[in-house]
């Protein structure tokens, strides 16, 4: 009896060594090395976007039904290992989702603490070319849009501030920083 092929997932790829990941990528027709990866990462803010570059440049030779998924997931896993000093959009999204989990479990202040870190990371991704929420969302590709998350964060800071006024002060700082980061967008409205 033929065994059903298993799908790839991030956890399965995380359990592989870096050498095993590169060997698999090479077998799939993506002849990259760790140095190639690091160089490509300088042109991108996300592992998924980096994998799109590979797919445009190389012809994929899948060994199995789900190997196309391996490519983008491997790029995300390799980012954490090979470019630990640069936070990717996927890592920001992971922290954002952690905040939503905390919120769903009734931990509003803990969610806001995680999201304050998310905000600092997002703020650092704003550039002259990426200075609107629309432009940021175009690159972000997270589970939530940055546009929606910004509203959730502001609302939950106010909610957390009911129990601890520190969160009202954080909310004021967040709103001020938001206006500076997205000043072009604010002025256009």
Q: Where are the model-predicted features located?
A:
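Generic structural signal for hydrophobic core residues of well-folded globular domains
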Residues: 25-29, 122, 153, 157-161
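Helical anchoring/docking segments at protein termini
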Residues: 1-91, 95
């Amino acid at each position: 009896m033929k065994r059903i092929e298993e799908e790839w997932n991030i956890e399965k790829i995380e359990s592989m060594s870096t050498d095993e990941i590169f060997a698999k990528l090479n077998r799939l027709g993506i002849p990259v090395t760790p140095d190639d990866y690091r160089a490509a990462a300088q042109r991108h803010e996300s592992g998924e976007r980096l994998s799109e570059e590979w797919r445009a440049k190389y012809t994929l030779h899948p060994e199995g039904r789900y190997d196309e998924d391996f490519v983008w997931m491997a790029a995300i896993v390799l980012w954490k290992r090979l470019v630990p000093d640069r936070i990717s959009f996927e890592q920001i999204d992971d922290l954002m989702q952690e905040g939503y989990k905390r919120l769903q479990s009734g931990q509003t202040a803990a969610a806001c603490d995680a999201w304050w870190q998310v905000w600092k990371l997002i703020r650092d991704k704003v550039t002259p070319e990426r200075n609107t929420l629309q432009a940021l969302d175009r690159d972000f590709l997270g589970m939530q849009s940055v546009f929606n998350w910004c509203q959730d964060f502001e609302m939950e800071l106010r909610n957390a501030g009911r129990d601890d006024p520190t969160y009202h002060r954080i909310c004021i700082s967040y709103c001020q920083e938001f206006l500076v980061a997205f000043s072009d967008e604010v002025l256009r409205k």
